[in-house]
């Protein structure tokens, strides 16, 4: 006999899954969990950029300005801008010995 005759070819009924050891409820729950996991993973990949950018930038908003007079708001904006402009065009040289 050759090796090719020893290989079994699956027939249509051979591909069916028969889980006699476990209950049907457990198999159904596992199947539903797997399908939900796949659906959530696909949505995560599709909307990754949109959702995570919105989440990341939403957390980086400035402090609340409710109840603060406009003059103080303007002063705060000027301080923030001056902090940004302090080092324009200046570089720090660090020499290692």
Swiss-Prot record:
Known regulation of activity: The M2 protein from most influenza A strains is inhibited by amantadine and rimantadine, resulting in viral uncoating incapacity. Emergence of amantadine-resistant variants is usually rapid.
Residues found modified as Phosphoserine: 64, 82
Bias-annotated ranges (Basic and acidic residues): 71-80
GO CC annotations, alphabetized: host cell plasma membrane; membrane; virion membrane
Listed transmembrane segments: 23-43
InterPro entries on file: Flu_M2
Virion surface side: 1-22
UniProt keyword Transferase present: no
Compartments in which it is found: Virion membrane; Host apical cell membrane
Family according to the record: Belongs to the influenza viruses matrix protein M2 family.
Note: When the channel is activated, one or more imidazole moieties of His-37 probably become bi-protonated.
Stated role: Forms a proton-selective ion channel that is necessary for the efficient release of the viral genome during virus entry. After attaching to the cell surface, the virion enters the cell by endocytosis. Acidification of the endosome triggers M2 ion channel activity.
Identification of the protein by name: Matrix protein 2
Native organism: Influenza A virus (strain A/Equine/Prague/1/1956 H7N7)
């Amino acid at each position: 006999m050759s090796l090719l005759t020893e290989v079994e070819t699956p027939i249509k009924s051979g591909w069916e899954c028969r889980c006699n050891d476990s209950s049907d409820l457990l198999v159904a729950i596992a199947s539903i969990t797997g399908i939900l996991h796949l659906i959530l993973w696909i949505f995560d990949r599709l909307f990754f950029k949109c959702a995570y950018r919105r989440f990341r930038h939403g957390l980086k908003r400035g402090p609340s300005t409710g109840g603060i007079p406009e003059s103080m708001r303007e002063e705060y904006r000027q301080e923030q801008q001056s902090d940004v402009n302090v080092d324009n065009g200046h570089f720090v040289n660090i020499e290692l010995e």
